[in-house]
From Swiss-Prot:
Keyword check for Hydrolase: yes
Stated name of the protein: Fructose-1,6-bisphosphatase class 1
Keywords: Calvin cycle, Carbohydrate metabolism, Cytoplasm, Hydrolase, Magnesium, Metal-binding
Family statement drawn from the similarity comment of this UniProt entry: Belongs to the FBPase class 1 family.
Gene: fbp
Organism, as annotated: Prosthecochloris aestuarii (strain DSM 271 / SK 413)
Binding site for Mg(2+) 2: D113, D116, E278
CDD domains the UniProt entry points to: FBPase
GO molecular function: fructose 1,6-bisphosphate 1-phosphatase activity; magnesium ion binding
InterPro entries assigned: FBPase_C_dom, FBPase_class-1, FBPase_N, FBPtase
Cofactor(s) needed by this chain: Mg(2+)
Residues binding substrate: D116, G117, S118, S119, N209, Y242, K272
Residues noted as binding Mg(2+) 1 in the record, renumbered to the chain: E92, D113, L115
Pathway: Carbohydrate biosynthesis; Calvin cycle
GO cellular component labels: cytosol
Amino acid sequence: MNKLITIERHFLEQQKSHPEATGELTDLLNDVAFAAKLVRREVVRAGLADILGMAGTTNVQGEEVKKLDLFANEKIINAIGEHGRFALMGSEENEGTIIPPNNDTGRYILLFDPLDGSSNIDVNVSVGTIFSIYRLTGDDPKEADINDCLQKGSEQVAAGYVIYGSSVMMVYTTGQGVHGFTYDPTIGEFLLSHENITTPERGKYYSINEGSLHQFNDSTVNFINYLKEDDEATGRPYSTRYIGSLVADFHRNLMTGGVFVYPATKGHPNGKLRLMYEANPLAFICEQAGGRATNGKERILDINPTELHQRTPLYIGSKEDVLKAEEFEKEG
C-alpha cells in the first residue's frame, strides 16, 4: 500500500467513526498490540535466548508447558494488566481468573491464549497469540468474577490473533469487518496491510490431523472422504494443508478459503480446543470475514459456556464448506 497507516492511527480513525466511543477500547487494543511486540521480540530469538524447550511443569489442561509459553503469558499479563483497563483476565495457562492491579476502573474482560501452537516453536513453525475482549457485566469492577468471563461468544466486543511466522501479522475485529496489520521491524510498528479481509464462500483446502482418523466418528470420516472425491462442479478434490498450529492453519484458510476441522474423538468426546480462548475469538473473526464456525451442530458463538476452560469440537472456515460439514454431522 502507498499510504502507511499504523495500527494506532487505524484504531483512532475507527474510533472517530463512532461518536459515542469513549476511547477505552482503542486503548485496550493498543495494549494488546504492544504486548504482541514483546512476545514477537522473544519468539524470533528464542533459540538464542535459552527459552526453547520444556519448563518442567504442566498447565491446567494437563499439558507440558514450554518455557516460551510461560514467558508469553507473563509478558501479556504484565504489559496489559498494569494499566487498569481490565477488571479481570483469563489465560489458557492459568487455572483461575487473574485479577490485574488497579482494576477498580476496568470495564472489560480479557481472555487469551498466550502462545498457541507452542509445541512447534522448537522446529521454527509459526505460532500465535489469540485474544478475546468482553464488557464487564456488572457495574463494579471490584466485584468481577468468573461469571463475567462466561459469556457467549456473540457478546465479544473485539477479538483477534497475532501470527508469528515469516512475517508477524495482527488480525482483529470489533464487529465492523476484519483488518490485518503486518509488523515492520525497521520502524517497530504494525502497518495496515490487509483491509476488510473477506474469506471465499467455498475453499479448496481442508485442515485436519488425519493421523487421528481412527478416532473420528463416522460422520467426520464421511465428510473428509467427500472432500477427497472428484467433482469439478464443487472444486473437489480438496487439497490437505495441516500445520498443527491452529492460528497458522486458520489464517491460511481465512485468506485462501478452506475449512479447519478439529472434531470430537473417542479420546476427547467433547472436543479438545478451548471454547473461550480459541474457538470463540476465531469464530468471531471468521463470521465477520463472511465465514462460518460451528461445533458440528451449533453455532460456536451461541454456545453458553459453563467452564473457563471448556472444550469444543470446531469446524471453521469458508461458509459453504462448514455448512457441508454440518450436513454430514446431522446425518451421522
